[in-house]
């Protein structure tokens, strides 16, 4: 195939796109087989079959009391009447955020979102050498709370301070505003003085002893539950909350049912942290490629020795997360890199440039780059982006066309898998809960920046027979960990 340098094509767009069509028509058999391996099972008609299989696993998790998926939490179903002033603490993996939020009373001239005012908000980076949750850590949090409260006049610091928390670590939940600190993640450890202590009591005692402040923790949520809390207040049509960034998760509210294990029902309605990443085992046979197997060899086990949604792998003692591995921002770039390396070896791409960086695991192709290539239809811009990323002076047009084809098929499969999960949850919720316009609230860098990925998910869902009579939209719930915690506190006050 004759190589064409894109640097010679900076002319009128009509001529330029004509040239692109000519190049793409020379698609290689290797590329064709790769595209086929990612997309052969992707069709709207298949959503019914595969969503039924995911639904079956979700129901098993609920019925058999899975300890790692469909985790129960106290329900938050805002009515829109919630109001008041709240202190919010949001502890994530590397950031502490503290805010004061004012939710005004319902007013005919104000939408629900317009009633929410973040009076003050400040964040602090938590360094790796400070990631020990002990008494001193809570004193540090207390000092930042005091700093925030002393710099505002919305909350009366001499009165009881209603507080909401977004806590991005596991808790042994004992009530809607109580949970024991036992296990952490994201590089943190727990001090002996805090282990098995109640988060509400530790925080309230620290602020009272150190600063004479009286906090009343009304609600404790994790990040996915906070999306649901904030989203349901802002949009009464919201039925699901989704996180899709470096990982994937969903959250939904379910009514009491004989199909749900009694231990998972905390009240007449329970909010479930679904841990969606652990589902999707049924998709391995028809959707997994050799590249997925390179990332996690368990994709090759068509008859797995365990249920991914019920327990860790008994052999490796690690979790297997099929949904996350095929859809999330951590793995989409690595899948792309692995395919590109195969095409390099086959002599199909990047033959006239230094491609050694492509051989670097989890670094040879960045998330920013896959997003740029997928979202951008200006081949000049993609050319310049690739040259800047890899230190090239030029890159062939056929290379760019091939790369876009690779990225497109990987994103197409990912969008189908996410849509399939949404359909499964629609079936779980049932027709009584759904109808007309339905909103799915979301957060996460992938859905926020991959606009075409997001649109493709919506198109798949809305074209499915199982979603007949429903029109789905994905809605970004901005600042959900702050707003959701405030709404949670207002709901339970």
UniProtKB/Swiss-Prot annotation:
All residue ranges annotated as the Hexokinase domain in the record: 27-490
Pfam families membership: Hexokinase_1, Hexokinase_2
Region spans: Hexokinase small subdomain: 79-221
Keywords: ATP-binding, Cell wall biogenesis/degradation, Cytoplasm, Glycolysis, Kinase, Mitochondrion, Nucleotide-binding, Nucleus, Transferase, Virulence
Known EC number: 2.7.1.59, 2.7.1.1
CDD domains assigned to the protein according to its UniProt record, in alphabetical order: ASKHA_NBD_HK
Broad class of where this protein is predominantly found: cytoplasm
One of the record's GO molecular function terms: fructokinase activity
Catalytic activity: N-acetyl-D-glucosamine + ATP = N-acetyl-D-glucosamine 6-phosphate + ADP + H(+); D-mannose + ATP = D-mannose 6-phosphate + ADP + H(+); D-glucose + ATP = D-glucose 6-phosphate + ADP + H(+); D-glucosamine + ATP = D-glucosamine 6-phosphate + ADP + H(+)
Coiled coil segments of this chain: none
Record GO biological process: adhesion of symbiont to host; biological process involved in interaction with host; cell wall organization; development of symbiont in host; filamentous growth; filamentous growth of a population of unicellular organisms; glucosamine catabolic process; glucose 6-phosphate metabolic process
Oligomeric and partner information: Interacts with histone deacetylase SIR2 under filamentation-inducing conditions.
Similarity section: Belongs to the hexokinase family.
Role according to the record: Component of the N-acetylglucosamine catabolic cascade that phosphorylates N-acetylglucosamine (GlcNAc), and allows the unique ability to utilise GlcNAc as carbon source. Converts GlcNAc to GlcNAc-6-P. Also able to phosphorylate glucose, glucosamine (GlcN), and mannose. Galactose, fructose, N-acetylmannosamine (ManNAc), mannosamine (ManN), galactosamine (GalN), and N-acetylgalactosamine (GalNAc) are not phosphorylated by HXK1. GlcNAc metabolism is closely associated with virulence and morphogenesis, and is involved in the cell wall synthesis.
Protein name: N-acetylglucosamine kinase 1
Source organism (scientific name): Candida albicans (strain SC5314 / ATCC MYA-2876)
Lineage summary: Eukaryota, Fungi, Dikarya, Ascomycota, Saccharomycotina
């Amino acid at each position: 195939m004759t190589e064409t340098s894109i640097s010679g094509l900076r002319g009128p767009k009509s001529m330029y796109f004509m040239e692109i069509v000519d190049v793409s028509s020379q698609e290689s058999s290797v590329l064709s087989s790769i595209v086929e391996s990612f997309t052969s099972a992707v069709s709207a008609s298949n959503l019914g079959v595969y969503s039924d299989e995911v639904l079956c696993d979700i129901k098993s998790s609920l019925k058999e009391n899975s300890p790692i998926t469909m985790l129960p939490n106290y329900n938050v179903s805002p009515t829109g009447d919630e109001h008041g002033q709240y202190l919010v603490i949001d502890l994530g993996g590397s950031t502490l955020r503290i805010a004061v939020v004012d939710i005004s009373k319902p007013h005919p001239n104000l939408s629900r979102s317009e009633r929410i005012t973040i009076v003050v908000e400040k964040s602090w980076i938590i360094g790796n050498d400070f990631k020990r949750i002990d008494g001193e850590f809570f004193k540090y949090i207390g000092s930042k709370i005091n700093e925030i409260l002393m710099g505002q006049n919305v909350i009366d610091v001499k009165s009881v301070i209603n507080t909401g928390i977004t806590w991005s670590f596991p808790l042994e939940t004992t009530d809607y505003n109580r949970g024991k600190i036992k296990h952490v993640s994201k590089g943190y450890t727990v001090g002996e003085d805090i282990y098995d202590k109640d988060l509400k009591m530790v925080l309230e005692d620290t602020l009272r002893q150190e600063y004479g402040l009286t906090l009343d923790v009304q609600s404790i949520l994790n990040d996915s539950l906070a999306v649901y809390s904030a989203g349901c207040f802002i949009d009464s049509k919201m039925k699901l909350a989704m996180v899709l960034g470096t990982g994937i998760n969903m959250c939904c509210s379910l009514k009491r049912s004989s199909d749900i294990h009694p231990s998972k029902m905390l009240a007449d309605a329970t909010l479930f942290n679904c841990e969606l990443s652990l589902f999707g085992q049924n998709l391995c046979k028809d959707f997994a490629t050799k590249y997925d197997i390179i990332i996690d060899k368990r994709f090759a086990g068509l008859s797995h020795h365990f249920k991914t949604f019920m327990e860790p792998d008994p052999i490796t003692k690690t979790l297997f997360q099929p949904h996350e591995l095929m859809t999330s921002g951590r793995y989409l770039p690595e899948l792309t890199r692995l395919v590109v390396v195969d095409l390099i070896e086959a002599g199909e791409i990047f033959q006239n440039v230094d491609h050694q960086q492509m051989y670097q695991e989890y670094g040879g192709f960045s998330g920013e780059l896959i997003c740029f290539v997928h979202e951008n239809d200006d081949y000049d811009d993609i050319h310049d982006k690739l040259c800047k990323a890899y230190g090239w002076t030029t890159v062939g047009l056929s290379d760019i066309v091939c790369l876009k084809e690779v990225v497109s098929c990987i994103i197409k499969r990912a969008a189908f898998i996410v849509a399939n999960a949404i359909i499964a949850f629609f079936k779980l919720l049932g027709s009584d809960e759904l109808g007309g316009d339905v909103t799915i609230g979301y957060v996460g860098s992938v859905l926020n920046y991959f606009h075409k990925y997001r649109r493709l998910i919506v198109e798949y869902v809305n074209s499915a027979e199982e979603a007949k009579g429903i029109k789905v939209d994905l809605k970004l719930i901005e600042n959900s960990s702050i707003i959701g915690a405030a709404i949670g506190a207002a709901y339970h006050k």
